[in-house]
Amino acid sequence: MELMKLEIVTPNGVIFDDDVKQVTLPGSEGEFGVLPKHATLVSLLDTGVIVIEKADGSEVAVAINSGYVKVDEEKTTCIVDGAVALSGEDSDLAKALEEAKELIKKAESSSVAIASAVSKVEQIGKSF
């Protein structure tokens, strides 16, 4: 099983740094997936949710408000203005979901992108 390194960095520090199977990113032109050995690219990230499939097959979601991504064959680096990890115990998850909704609503993005991101965060909340 091939893995790649994924790093998500905010102005406050690194919030995710691990090997993953794949990641789905909210690009400025729509969502796109990245697998190990992906072609090199740099792209804008829009308000939305990063969905990560970890090495053990579990999924983790991180809500972001905007940023950039640099992809190469072995590593994907997301540099974002703000991010909230949507995982943890039930009480922590409820707080994280509220923080994620606030983060997304503060983004200077189109209302369609914000509504889509909030909807995705709410769906994640229902699945836990």
UniProtKB/Swiss-Prot annotation:
The lineage of its organism: Bacteria, Pseudomonadati, Campylobacterota, Epsilonproteobacteria, Campylobacterales. GO terms for molecular function: ATP binding; proton-transporting ATP synthase activity, rotational mechanism. F-type ATPases have 2 components, CF(1) - the catalytic core - and CF(0) - the membrane proton channel. CF(1) has five subunits: alpha(3), beta(3), gamma(1), delta(1), epsilon(1). CF(0) has three main subunits: a, b and c. Belongs to the ATPase epsilon chain family. It is found in: Cell inner membrane. The keyword Cell inner membrane applies. This is ATP synthase epsilon chain. The gene is atpC. Keywords: ATP synthesis, Cell inner membrane, Cell membrane, CF(1), Hydrogen ion transport, Ion transport, Membrane, Transport. It comes from Sulfurovum sp. (strain NBC37-1). Produces ATP from ADP in the presence of a proton gradient across the membrane. NCBIfam families: ATP_synt_epsi (TIGR01216). It holds the Pfam family ATP-synt_DE_N.
